[in-house]
UniProtKB/Swiss-Prot annotation:
Encoding gene per record: Spc25
Protein family according to the UniProt entry: Belongs to the SPC25 family.
Organism: Rattus norvegicus (Rat)
Keyword Cell cycle: yes
Disulphide-bonded residues: none
InterPro entries xref list: Spc25, Spc25_C
Name of the protein in question: Kinetochore protein Spc25
Region feature Interaction with the N-terminus of SPBC24, mapped onto this chain: 1-146
Primary location recorded for the protein, binned into one broad class: nucleus
Any single GO BP term: cell division
CC annotations in GO: cytosol; kinetochore; Ndc80 complex; nucleus; outer kinetochore
Alphabetical UniProt keywords: Cell cycle, Cell division, Centromere, Chromosome, Coiled coil, Kinetochore, Mitosis, Nucleus, Phosphoprotein
Length: 226
């Protein structure tokens, strides 16, 4: 091989090395950008999921309140009905008074029917909204890899997946309940997180549940990479 051919060969090798290093650097920048975008997406979706969960809790409380109101109305109407029937028995034979009392009973029945219909309509509307919220929660669950289950002991179990890139289906979980002091109580964390107690105290003070979920997920991710 002559000197000119050797020089041309060395030049080709250098050009190939420069192109390879440039592409490697460019690909690394793209990967880092995608990683940051993914983290932002996860954080935003976690916050939306928290809002949906809070709305579900409010809807459940409203439905319970409506049911309690209906029970109270039923009891009140029954008491009034009993009183009216007692009065009818006392004035039996007095046609005019009986007619008045009968009209009162009819009014009470109509009032009860109206209130029952109002509460029933509100319950149906709330149930439909809960279905929509559950559908949204399922969508966020699929995107975030987060599943929420109700387990014995009045607890909710939060199960994260897509944490470990090598094993996306591997579950990372913890349980949550409300103690007698009306505070969040976190337990049964797997794998164990040293920082979980700190996260628990913070969510008790701030009541920012979406931030709590985001912090726990980040801690699980960090544990995998460490």
């Amino acid at each position: 091989m002559g000197e000119d051919e050797l020089a041309a060969f060395e030049k080709s090798i250098n050009e190939f090395g420069d192109k390879f290093r440039y592409r490697l650097s460019d690909n690394r920048s793209q990967v880092l950008g995608l990683k940051d975008a993914f983290k932002d997406s996860i954080r935003a979706l976690s916050e939306k999921l928290s809002l949906k969960l809070k709305e579900e809790e409010r809807m459940a409380e409203m439905i319970l309140e409506y049911k309690n109101q209906l029970c109270k109305q039923n009891k009140l109407i029954q008491e009034k009905k009993d009183n009216v029937l007692k009065m009818i028995a006392e004035v039996k034979g007095k046609g005019q008074e009986v007619e008045v009392l009968t009209a009162n009973i009819q009014d009470l029945k109509e009032e009860y029917a109206r209130k029952k219909e109002t509460i029933s309509t509100a319950n149906k509307a709330n149930e439909e909204r809960l279905k929509r919220l559950q559908k949204s929660a399922d969508l966020y669950r699929d995107r975030l890899g987060l599943e929420i289950r109700k387990i014995p002991g009045d607890k909710l179990q939060f199960i994260f997946t897509s944490i470990d890139p090598k094993n996306p289906e591997s579950p990372f979980m913890f349980s949550l309940s409300i103690n007698e002091a009306k505070e969040y109580e976190v337990s049964d964390c797997s794998p164990h997180l040293e920082c979980l107690a700190e996260f628990q105290e913070k969510v008790r003070k701030t009541n920012n549940f979406s931030a709590f979920l985001a912090n726990v997920r980040k801690a699980f991710i960090a544990k995998v990479h460490n």
